[in-house]
Amino acid sequence: YEEESSDRAFEEEVMIVGFGNAPVKPEGEGVSFDNANEGFTARYEHETVALAFALTEEAVEDNLYDRLGSRYTKALARSMANTKQIKAANVLNNAFSSSFPGGDGVSLINSSHPLSSGAVSANRAATFADLNETSIEDALIRISTQTDDRGLNIALQGVKLIVPPQLQFVADRLLSSPGRVGTSDNDINSVVNQGMLPEGYVVNHYLNDPDAYFFKTDVPDGFKYFVRSPMQTSLEGDFDSGNMRYKARERYSFGFSNWRCVDGSQGA
């Protein structure tokens, strides 16, 4: 994710539809003009994430605060960090669902992303396939031939493969072997040989679908993480009960602007 700070209740990013190819200007004639327009708007709704625990007045009185407090504080930090990982992964977990549309009105991974020209574009295969040599090559070809809304080739490249734990061994064989996997042919592994996924693969333990996998691309303004309020902690006593209460709180949002940031499959 690209991390950015925010000072508002939400953030909106308007995508720009650029210009077409520049035409030849005949001698003595005026230059041609083109119009750049605004595309769809991606919206990031910040969420407040907070959790607290309390120690009784008696526990504090019996000098248990130092022993229990430090352990509870570490557990609280783990809970906050785990929640953030889940929310970050949910952008991919919900990538195929129409219930979580992006700024263009369709799911993050879709076969019919609408373009300003009236055409549609896809960041998935027409038929989902399991992770294998062919599906990797097809995805990398699809990524490299993506165009912008005006039909200009933007020469995207895949950066890394993101897989759940269930696919880590398949991914390792496919991206670590110098030769083709599962064949007796003495052919090179073209993906490895050309360095087409420079960051290799990464295992995301928070992905829900054991068959789904994703290719992150190098398009700008893709996945974004907005920090509205960094992690803050506070400690106070409760007058009525005498308990000591410890709270952790932060505000942030995860999302995406340009859907070309990823290509993916749910598996066959």
Give, region by region, the residue ranges found by the protein language model:
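Flexible, active-site-adjacent loop/turn segments at secondary-structure boundaries
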Residues: 42-47, 58, 98, 106, ...
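Alpha-helical scaffold segments that mediate packing/assembly in large oligomeric complexes
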Residues: 66-71, 78-142
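Assembly/oligomerization interface modules of large self-assembling protein complexes
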Residues: 1-49
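Solvent-exposed, non-transmembrane amphipathic alpha-helical segments
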Residues: 21, 73, 89-96, 100, ...
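Long, contiguous amphipathic alpha-helices that act as assembly "spine/axial" helices in icosahedral shell
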Residues: 41-99, 161, 246-248
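Short alpha-helical interface patches
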Residues: 18-20, 29-34, 49, 55-64, ...
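Solvent-exposed, flexible loop/coil residues
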Residues: 5, 37, 48, 59, ...
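Sequence/fold signature of self-assembling virion shell proteins
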Residues: 109-149, 155-160, 166-268
